[in-house]
Each structure stands twice: as structure tokens, then as C-alpha cells.
Amino acid sequence: MKNHMSDMSPEEVRQLVRKGQMTGPTAGMAASYAQANLVVLQKDLAFDFLLFCQRNQKPCPVLDVTDAGSPVPAIAAPGADIRTDFPKYRIYRHGVLTEEVTDITPYWKDDDVGFLIGCSFSFEQALINQHIPIRHIDEGVNVPMYKTDIDCVPAGPFSGKMVVSMRPIPERLAVRAAQVTSRFPAVHGAPVRIGNPQSIGISDLHQPDFGDAVTVREGEVPVFWACGVTPQAVIMEAKPDIVITHSPGHMLITDIRNESLAVL
Amino acid sequence: MKNHMSDMSPEEVRQLVRKGQMTGPTAGMAASYAQANLVVLQKDLAFDFLLFCQRNQKPCPVLDVTDAGSPVPAIAAPGADIRTDFPKYRIYRHGVLTEEVTDITPYWKDDDVGFLIGCSFSFEQALINQHIPIRHIDEGVNVPMYKTDIDCVPAGPFSGKMVVSMRPIPERLAVRAAQVTSRFPAVHGAPVRIGNPQSIGISDLHQPDFGDAVTVREGEVPVFWACGVTPQAVIMEAKPDIVITHSPGHMLITDIRNESLAVL
């Protein structure tokens, strides 16, 4: 067994998860590879949700969509099974969390469609590679996330405001952070705003709507990126009969190298 | 009236088209703005086609998708009507071209979904801005297009090979051409291949499958980009009851500035 799960291959991590030997958060595992969020919807809602993602690519960057009834993400991880390879799942009925499980095989239906959504871990790695510090990692907490007053473009029953994540960046590095993350449109891409939280409807940085507050130091500017919590919030508002998501922080390790997601 | 249609606004061109006063090709009109290809499908095929586009973004870059039954592309051109604002349309029944018309209002159905697909005009403008010559423009012909042996990722009934367009580029500028077009993933983006046509199944550059052959000069390398003819070819193979497309070269002028499509 490898000393560090960060050195494992995606398949090695997925095997541990599939066997139930790893049920915790996936941050830092198989570090060069993209991790994916999950949304499972029934086929009748799949077109409108895919359309919502297409219209709101910054908060909803789609890495892969499974064929109806197939649990295999053929593009992102052909050897994976989305019913078993996330460490933890949440089941929502009519917008209410009813169960948290480690295997959704009993819930899987013939017309289910799985959406794998890109995650900020990929661009955080790119920032770290540039020696740009990530405060919530250094402080050992979840990234702070905020509801904004930015409207998503609606599609069918799906509509709502964009949720953003915030990372405090030294002012001299803010432009570099924008450049570096612009290379990765498949995982939220460039920031939506640098500084001035009020301008996007955030009144108090110390009171995030999701995740944990982090320290913003003298000489740092808060930088806001579109966040994958957006599609989840939008789906809950639409209150489908049933929707399955990953549990926060408990992602699928794909076979896609972070660096291969760069457009330049 | 403006001296040159290249200086007109998108809305001005669309008005002329809508009134039937302009029924020709749109190349060069409202030159700073993105032009869009069209595919209209009935709702029951829309999910699989959107999925096909999501899985094959280089040949099928989606700029906008209309809500079922709505002819208004709310993101790309909120003042436009896709039933009247393309100069010419083609109607295909079971994969066979049956009519060419200038107005599809009589054909429009309550559950029709319109897909606006990005077009190479946008990145050609970016190349021209870098003083990289575009041979088929200089020779006054259509861009040469070739079927390759590159498989698209299938989705539902949609599958087939990628079609590419070719532009001969001076060898010293080929890398620059790749860089410049990489900025525009929403309009086919980076080349799929530089040189060696045989490596993607093209046996004779002088015999394009679509469009016209162009001169490749000494010291030039053929550069291949994914082409918007791909989704059309794939749809014809699927032989839906009815599908409506724009006529080749007869595009919609959107309100999206080419330069705003750049990711960097």
C-alpha cells in the first residue's frame, strides 16, 4: 500500500471506495487527477438540467454525462461505477435530504442519468503550483461559499442565484490567479469577481452561506469563483421527486489529469 | 445605409434578412460579431443532440439553445427570431434535403428546439488580426473540408466521424495559429492536427469532401480544425423525421462579439 493516498492512481482510490474501505472526504487524493461532483436525475429532467449547465458553464462545468441507465462515465473514468465509487451520497426527495449512504445501487433506476460536474480542487492545484496560497487549505477548513445576487440563466424548472467560493489572494497575485484559473474553463475557470463583495450581493465575508469563514489578511483581496454548489442549490429549489448527489467533499476521482483540462 | 455590410450592427443585418432584402451568404457581415450555424430538432431528440454536443465540443461548440417552442435565442441574440433571421434554410426529411426556404415559420412546431452552433468565422477573424493569411478567403472559395477517421463520442442515435476544415499556414506561423485559436473554445478552438493529413485519414488534400480545394504553397503546412459540418453530417446519418438547418454560408449574426468568446 502506498504511503500517501495522494500518490495513488484514480483506480486504486476508486477500488478502496468501492470496497467500502474509504468512506471519507477525497481532498488531496490522487492529487494530479480531476475530482467530480455528482448529480443523478431521472431522464425526464435530464435535458433541462443539461441545458441549465450549458447556459451556466462557470458554476456548472460538465465533465461527463452518463447514458440513461448506465452507471459508467465513459469519458471521465471508463472503469468507474458512479453507484459505488463516491465515498458518500445524499438522497433528496422533493428537495429534502432523507438519506446519506455509501452505495446507491439499490436506488438506481433504468432511466437515471448521472452528471459529473468539475470541481475547484483542479484549479486549486494549479494555483498551488504557482505558489499562490489557498487559505482554507492552510487553515484546515472548508472553502467559504456565498449566495450572490447574480442570476443564473434559467432552463425549464431550474433557476436561481449563483453561489461563489472565496479565496483571499495577496493583491500582487490576484491577476496571476485570474490568469492561471482562466486556463481551466472545465473546472469553473476565471474568477467572477475580484474584490468588492457588496457588488455581487455579499454583505459579510465572515458569514458564509456554506462552508467556513477564513482569515482575510491585510494586503489581500477576496477573489470569487463560481461554485459547484450552485447546481445543487438550483436542483433542490426545483424539488424533483428524487435526486442523488455526492456528499460534500466526497467526490469521484476521475481518470482526467487536471492539467489536461487546460485550454492553453 | 452603410457603405459596407461589414460595418452594420447585427440587428441591422438581421432586419434586412428578416424583410427578405438579404438572402445571400453572410461572410464578412457585421465583422466583429459571431455568426452561428443552426440545427432545429424536435424536443424528443434534443437531449441526445445536446449530449452529443457536450461530448464533442470541438466540432459542436454550442453558443445557445432555445427553449422548446421559442424561436428566440435569449443568450446569443435576444432580439432575433431563428425562424426568419437566417438568409436561407434547408429542410431535411429522413436525412434527405427536400426544401430550401428563406423563412421556416410555416415549419415551426411547438416543441422545436433550436441549437446555435459556433462557426469558424470567429476564429478566422482572430487569425486575420494576427496577419495570418486565410487562403480560401484570398482565393474567394469555400473552406476545404474533409471527413477524418476520428470517431466522435456517440450519444443516443448520433454518431459518426469528425469533419475538419483545413487552412494552409506558413510553417513559422503554425504554432501562433494554434495559440490564437486556442483562445476560442466556443468556436472550435485549437486545431486538431498540424500537418500529416494521412494521420487522420485524409488521403488527398486536393479532393475535399465538402467545399473547395485551395493552394498549399511551398513552406506551408496544412492545419486542421474541427468543423461545424460534423453535427450536420451526424444528424443526417440519424435520419430524423425532420430537421431544419441553415444553408451553408447563410448564418445568423449574433450579438456576441467574437472577442468576448475568448477565454483569455
UniProtKB/Swiss-Prot annotation, chains A, B:
GO MF term set: lyase activity
SUPFAM superfamilies: PSTPO5379-like (SSF160920)
Entries under InterPro entries matching the protein: D-Glu_cyclase, Putative_hydro-lyase, UPF0317
Domain of life: Bacteria
Alphabetic keyword roster: Lyase
Pfam families in the cross-refs: D-Glu_cyclase (PF07286)
Family: Belongs to the D-glutamate cyclase family.
Protein name per UniProt: Putative hydro-lyase RBAM_004300
Species assigned in the record: Bacillus velezensis (strain DSM 23117 / BGSC 10A6 / LMG 26770 / FZB42)
